[in-house]
Amino acid sequence: LQWLILDHNLLENSKIKGKVFSKLKQLKKLHINHNNLTESVGPLPKSLEDLQLTHNKITKLGSFDGLLNLTFVHLQHNQLKEDAVSAAFKGLKSLEYLDLSFNQMSKLPSGLPASLLTLYLDNNKISDIPDEYFKRFNGLQYLRLSHNELADSGIPGNSFNISSLVELDLSYNKLKNIPTVNENLENYYLEV
């Protein structure tokens, strides 16, 4: 079994028994979208590449440590705060796509892997960006921070000067000035 899709059910964490997923040694895709999960599922098999847990009620993430093939993680439309996210992704060197949009983060989470190419954090409550936060994401290409609480004072001058960045969405924030961006940027969204 390589794909397991359990979308649009009434699954709860208490009904998912022990190591049910880790026994599936060839599993590459696990989708449990639109359910009643309150925390991430696990343990998960090392073969997993794509994990989708969207439209749940997740407030807690376990560690994804050891999932060396995990490339895509979709966690949008949950109830995650930055503290729940910070430790979960440490050590993942293959993670390229992370969607944390439509959650309850007021700060950017720490500990995200430098391997990310796509990072979606739109529709949260993020109000500022720590200095040089995005500097370690050498290959970051797509960044969405629209529908947050970002204001000019919360964005250090060099925040978006990322040479690899091709798309940046800062729409629907509280910006009065246009932040500095790298000349390689192809798509820049600042709708109000």
UniProtKB/Swiss-Prot annotation:
Keyword hit for Glycoprotein: yes
GO (cellular component) term, any one: extracellular space
A GO MF label: collagen binding
Pfam families per record: LRR_1 (PF00560), LRR_8 (PF13855)
Keywords, sorted A to Z: Extracellular matrix, Glycoprotein, Leucine-rich repeat, Proteoglycan, Repeat, Secreted, Sulfation
Coiled coil: none
LRR repeats: 1-23, 26-46, 47-68, 69-90, 94-114, 115-136, 139-162, 164-185, 186-192
Cellular location(s): Secreted, Extracellular space, Extracellular matrix
Description of post-translational modifications: Sulfated on tyrosine residue(s). Contains keratan sulfate.
Similarity comment: family membership: Belongs to the small leucine-rich proteoglycan (SLRP) family. SLRP class II subfamily.
Assembly, per entry: Binds to laminin.
PANTHER family in alphabetical order: AGAP008170-PA, LUMICAN
Protein name (record): Lumican
Name of the encoding gene: LUM
